[in-house]
Each structure stands twice: as C-alpha cells, then as structure tokens.
Amino acid sequence: MKIRVIVPVTTREFVGATRPQYVAAARPDAEISVVGLDRGPVSLESDYEDALAVPDILTKVRVAEAEEMDALIIDCMADPGLAPARELASIPIVGPAQAAMHLAAILAHRFSVVTVLERDIPLIDHLARLYGLEGYLASARPVNIPVLELGKDQERLVEALVEQSVRAVVEDGAHIIVFGCTGMKGLAQQVEQALEEQGYTVPVIDPSLAALKLAEALVDMGLSHSKRTYPPPPPKEIVGYPQGASDGPSQKLLAPVSGASSHPGKLRRRARIRVIIPVVGEHWIAPVQEAYGRAGRPGTEISAVAIDRGPASIESVRDEALAIPAVLSQVRTAEEEGMDAVVLDCMADPGLDPARELASIPVIGPAQAAMHLAAMLAHRFSVITVLEQGIPGVHRQALRYGLTEKVASVRAINIPVLEMSEDRERVTRAVIEESAKAVCEDGAHIIVPGCTEMIGMAPVVQECLAERGCEVPVIDPPAMSVKLAEGLVDMGLAHSKRTYPPPPDKEIVGYL
C-alpha cells in the first residue's frame, strides 16, 4: 500500500517533520512518501493562501497518480484543493477536515474544533456546512498561535489546546474535540490525558491520523470518490499550467518508508473485534465470522456470536426492539472478554446508542459507518434495502445521523432476509437492478447496500454497474465497519462518554 502525503506549503521543515509522524501511525504494510510544494505559501492561514497553494497541489496530485500511489492525503485542515483534486484523479484523495469531522460525528453528537487563529473560525464553520455536519459543530475556538510557531514551544501549545478544549466542553457543550490544524500532530493523547486529569473525559481526534486511517481503509476496500460527484474536467488548454504529470516541477520527494522495518515504534496492535449477530440462530456464526474475517487486515482477530433470544431476522422496528436486550448482553460480554471493538451485524444498527452507554470500547453500527463514508465520497447516495416496508426506517436513520440531504433514494429488492442466503445470485441481480435505477433515475452518485447479508457483493455490483455505464462506487458496510473498528483501535479512540454517559446504577428486573 503506497500513500502519498502532500504538505501544501513550501516550508521544508514542515515536510521533514511530517514524514516520521505519519510513518509512526501507519500500518506496517504501508509505504508513506511525503512531498511539499515548490510554489505557494509558507503556511496556510487564509483563503487567499489556500487559493495560491491549490495549483501546485494539483500538480502533485497528477504526479502521485502517475507514480501509482494507492491513495493521497492533503495534509491541511482547510482541505485545500480537495474537490478539484478529486476531479483530476481516480485514486482516493482524503482531506483531514472531512475525515476528522465525520469521525467526530460518528463518535459524538457535538464536536468542537480547536484551531489556530481567530480568523480560522469562519473556515471551520464553512467546512462543517459543506460536509453536511453543521448540526454537530458545537464551536470553533482558537489557540491564537500562528502556524509557523506551533512547533517552537510544545508546552505552550499543549497548555493552549487544553485550555480551549476545556472551554469548549464547559461553555459550548462539546462532547469530542477535533484539532483544527495538522501542525498539531502527535498531541491528541497528551491533551486527552490532561483533560482527563481535570475531570473532562472526552476523546480528542488528530485529523492527520483520521485521514491516514481513512486512506488505508479505502485502499483495503478498493474504494474511491464518486466520479459522478467529481467528474473529470473537460479537456482544454489552460495557459501557464502543465497538463501532464511529466510536465510538472521536480517533486523533491523524501524516500518512501516501509514502516514494518524502519520504525520500531510503529503502531502494531492487533485488533480483537467481536461481531454481534442480532438474530437467533447459531448457523449464522460461521459464515458471518468468515465473511467479516476477509475484511480484516492481517493480524485482526474477528469472532462472531449470535443472540440467544429475539427474532430470527430483523425487518421491522418491532424485530429490532426485541433483539436489543440480548445485543446489550453480548456487548457487555465482549468488553469483559477483552475485545477491542464491537460491530453490530445489522444495517438497523440495533441498540447502538444504549450499547455505547454500556461499553467503553468502540461499538460500530454498519449503517452509520457506511452512510458517513458515502457522504465523504459523494454528494448523493442511495441505499438498496431488503423490503419496501423497510424504506422509512432507512430515511429515519439518515435523519438520525444528520445526512438526510445526502440521500438520493432508498430502494428495495423485496427479498426477505431469511431467503437471501438461499440464492445469492438472485439477490446480487436484484441489488444490481435497483442500484442501476438509483443511479440513472434517482441521481445517486454512490450505492450503499442496505443489509449486512449483502456482505461481499459490493465489488461485483460495482463492476456490473460500470458495464452498464452506471459507474459509481459501491460500499460494503460490514467491511467499512471492520475498517473503522481497526482505525479506532489504532488511534486509541472510542465514542464520547458525554454523548453516551454510563446508565445510572440501579436494579433492572429480569436483566443482568
């Protein structure tokens, strides 16, 4: 896996400092190369400077794709040039702000961004609106230390980050903190610990880490941004700019690093993930465990369990309600057994909120994970669900996750869940047919299969859609859930206990 990081400034010290920080956090099989700009500003602290950085960013994007990089990160919280870069390239291109804000929205109901200067606050507000997350943004607060001074006095920076984070929690109601500059790399755990010591238990997200883990996940899943949202620009002469990667200025690349051999401090923790099947029936366990196991990276341990009381399948709100008590029991057991994360194997995300109140380890809902990923890769997504009667439930979920405006449509294949395993070919054909209609008739730019029983179908559906001229990405929600779980374990993050506080300690008759 080859990941290129573009540091969108001309300051060589920033470029040199960036490489070891990414390498230390990357997977052992990831090769990280870093490049700065040959023309542009020394730091980015205004729209004006962002605009002047973009032309050379695009040159670097062309070069990265020509050099067969698997993914690319633009290392700045302004996400400069993200949209035009995605028009220009087919490989995944990740913006730290987009990745971190969506991750914050998955883990908490309200996040605050602690940024650099007062003048950056309107930018944060704008990005939250652009990414459809305005309702999640509690505040943006500055440390009032210019970018070029961030690395000169780390103690002063940490004190300012802690001070503004405390104010964000106490005064603004933030449940999770997002650093507002990639120049704050490597300080998240230190700030989180300092907040804990002051009595404020909130997760702290490093946007560079969020971007890296998203890039790794996209490469693993073979996904990229939708070319219907980001179509290639029309061919035309653009005076004064190179049209091909070979025409660009020299790259001045730092040598690619294979972290497996070069950095003994690299994150190598093996994630232990429990998949909870929220229906009754031990016959589900082996195939589910095998299917999820294929999505995990080498070393990830995945075990599956089914519930012992509840419905045989989930196709209604009633079914979901009757499954949740047993799901919660399994969540408790998973944490007691030392699991690192839990995935709920159902696109209804049954019991996600109470499970997060109950547990401190990450609990992942496939629908939440897949919808947020779809919103990052495209402007409009469609969900292909099971039955017609389940369509309102999908719309409720999109509303719950603040993504209603991103939904192009919800379509059903009208094959009951209990019949899906009997004829996978029939199910795949039905998903392809409804997906094609979603693209051609509803304007979908990306497809989300709406049942975890459709696991593993995404590549086939995506290929068949392309053959029909409906080329869009297709997300595999279970695979995305595994990737999110692995990334959270790598980053030492979980949901916010301010959004999901532990339930009161009291007797509940009939339950453990």
PLM regions and their residue ranges:
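Active-site rim beta-loop-alpha module in soluble metabolic enzymes
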Residues: 128-181, 190, 398-451
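Glycine-rich, highly charged phosphate/nucleotide-binding loops
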Residues: 46-63, 156-164, 316-333, 426-434
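Short, glycine-/small-residue-rich phosphate/pyrophosphate-handling segment
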Residues: 13, 106-141, 216-250, 283, ...
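Short beta-strand segments enriched in small/hydrophobic residues
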Residues: 1-16, 111-115, 267-285, 381-385
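N-terminal beta-loop-helix "entrance" segment that forms/cooperates
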Residues: 33-55, 148-153, 306-325, 418-423
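C-terminal alpha-helical cap/extension of soluble enzyme domains
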Residues: 4-7, 25, 29-30, 35, ...
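Short, acidic/small-residue loops that bind anionic groups at enzyme active sites
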Residues: 86-107, 192-212, 356-377, 462-481
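Periplasmic-binding protein-like
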Residues: 69-76, 174-182, 339-346, 444-452
